[in-house]
C-alpha cells in the first residue's frame, strides 16, 4: 500500500508533519543567513520582534494575514472540488474593481457600515465573474483550469492598468489610481483590539476586514463539511468516477466551486482597497493570490489551518521587513528566499516526511 493512502491521526497529518516542514525550512533559511555572515538566532529574534514586538508590528502582521486568509480560502474551496485555482491573484484584482466602484459611488452618501456589505457583494460578484470563464471552459470544453486561470491573471493585471490609466484616474494627476475614498468608503481600524492588550495600533492598517475574513473561514467550514454541496464538492475532488456514479453533475459543481473560489479571492480586496489605501491602485494585490496557494497547502485546506498559516506568512512579511531594516546584509531579496523556502516545504514538499511518519506510526501504534 502506498504511504499516501495510509491513514494517520489528525495530530500527525495536520500538526506534526506541517511543523516538521516548517522547522526544516527555517533551519535551511538559518544556514543561508549564516552563509552571508549574519547570526541566524539574531535574525530569528528580529523576525519575532518585528512581527510581535509592538502593537504596530502585530497590526501589520494581522493586516497581511487578512489578505492571505481570503486567498487561502479561495484556493482551498477549489481544491476540495478537485480544481487547482491559480487565478486568485487576477480574481482579487477584479474584485478590487468591484469594491472600488461601490466605494466611489456611495462614500459621499452613506456611512462605512452601509458601504461595506455592498462592497463585499460587489467584490465577490466581480471576482466570481472573473472565475466563471475558466470554470466554464473547464466544465464544458475541457480546458485545463490551471492554464486558463494563469492566463486570466495576466489579463486582469493588464485590464487594471488600462482602467486606472485611462478611465478611473483622477483628472490632472499622474499616479494611476482612483481618488481617495471619503469616510463612507473607508473601513475603520481595529485599534480597540490593541487597546485591550495595553498597546497601540500605531500606523498599522489592521482593519475590520479581518473580522470578515474570520467569518468567511467559518462560512467555508460550514459549506465544505456541513452541507450537501460541500459533500458533492469533496466527492468530486476525491474521485470524479465516484461522483459520476453518485449522480453528481460534474459541470455544475465545477462552476459553483470556481464561483465561490473567485468570490473569496475578490473579497480580499476589501483589506488593501478600503481598509488601507482608501483608493484603488495598481499592484494592490501584491502577490497575495499566489501566497494563498502556499497558505492553503500548509493549512491542509482547512479553514483553521489556513488562518494559522496566514498568520505565519503575515509574520514572515512583517518580520522580514524588520530584518532587512536592522540587518542590511539581509536584503529584501534574501527575505523572499526565506519565504520561498517556507512555500517550498509547505507546498511542493508537503509529503516529504509522510513516509517516515507512516513507518514510525505503524511501529508504535496500539494494536
Language model feature labels by segment:
Residues 37-42, 79-98, 139-148, 232, ...:
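Short, non-helical or kinked segments that cap or interrupt transmembrane helices
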Residues 1-24, 30, 238, 245-252, ...:
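Cytosolic-side transmembrane-helix boundaries in multi-pass membrane proteins
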Residues 18-34, 71-75, 96, 100-102, ...:
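Hydrophobic core segments of alpha-helical transmembrane domains in multi-pass membrane transport
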Residues 259-340:
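Transmembrane alpha-helical segments in multi-pass inner-membrane proteins
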Residues 194-279, 303-304:
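Helix-loop-helix "hairpin" substructures at the membrane interface of multi-pass membrane proteins
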Residues 31-36, 42, 46, 51-106, ...:
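Single transmembrane alpha-helix segments in multi-pass membrane proteins
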Residues 149, 153-225, 279, 334, ...:
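Transmembrane helix-bundle core of multi-pass membrane transporters
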Residues 5-16, 79-88, 111-113, 117-185, ...:
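Short loop segments and helix-boundary regions at transmembrane helix junctions
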